[in-house]
Amino acid sequence: MVRRIGVLMGGLSAEREVSLRSGRAVCAALESRGYEVVPIDVNRDVARTVRETGIELAFIALHGPLGEDGAVQGLLEVLGIPYTGSGVLASALAMDKIATKKILAHAGLPVPEYRELEAGDADSARAVVAELGLPVVVKAPTQGSSIGVYIVEREEDLEARITDAVAYGGTRVLVEKFIAGPELTAAVLGNREPRVLPLIEIVSATGKYDYESKYTPGLSDHLIPPRVPREVQERVSDLALRAYRALGCRGFARVDLIVSGNEAFILEINTIPGLTDVSLFPDAARAAGMSFPDLVEHLVRLAQER
């Protein structure tokens, strides 16, 4: 039985502070259940650190590039250490919003209409506005926590927002048709037989669910159940499960969707959802009757089934 668990947190991405909050919460939960916990603030010496600590299992509480994108997962595979969450391929695919959309669309799942643009291609940017209309959403394709996400309402602002998004790395951006409607999130839990926990509707006090709204208490409400018809909720749960399976996720993931009328569109998949005191996945687990320590321990058990 696994007793010595390393909690990998912090890391090198723009989501470092959120990851530290998730990691500390996980450490406390594991300690409350009697595990020997080794907090590991991930840096470029992580391979040596993991070997020297002698951990039996890694609980990955990292967010963003070099943590959620398959890099650390691959390292742990090489070291022969079991870990929580999805494997290398699913992690890498879900971290890239453009790759995710291509896979979901190929699987016949609904996604907002989108285009992939290279920075500096002004002609293509103008063509996108003509094709998608305004407003559009510009996204840095390999960031999370709404980092590098901009709603563009005027054509003259598009190139500047593309430049802003590219500043987070790479040369590509995702430009997505803006869809107005309630935003729902589906927490999916499990390996071969995953299940969807109670759905959550996200209501932001500022009108947009950005980084500040996500991680500042009081700036967003998590409504359970969502204020959409039962048949829409069932549709959202089904889409979330199908998306989870299409990418080959394991352990847990959070699928974000937008609802327009009776239709739902998948926005993205988060393979390491936030585990802070204001995060969505723990709220969904609580609504399903799982305390936070219950959830964390269940993720450890799922990791051992790999």
Swiss-Prot record:
Cofactor note: Binds 2 magnesium or manganese ions per subunit.
Gene3D superfamilies in the cross-refs: 3.40.50.20, ATP-grasp fold, A domain, ATP-grasp fold, B domain
Chain positions recorded as Mg(2+) 1 binding sites: 256, 268
Superkingdom of this protein's organism: Bacteria
Catalytic reactions of this protein: 2 D-alanine + ATP = D-alanyl-D-alanine + ADP + phosphate + H(+)
An example molecular function term from Gene Ontology annotations: D-alanine-D-alanine ligase activity
CC terms in the record's Gene Ontology section: cytoplasm
UniProt cross-references to NCBIfam families, sorted A to Z: D_ala_D_alaTIGR (TIGR01205), PRK01372.1 (NF002378)
Protein's name according to its UniProt entry: D-alanine--D-alanine ligase
Lineage: Bacteria, Bacillati, Bacillota, Clostridia, Thermoanaerobacterales
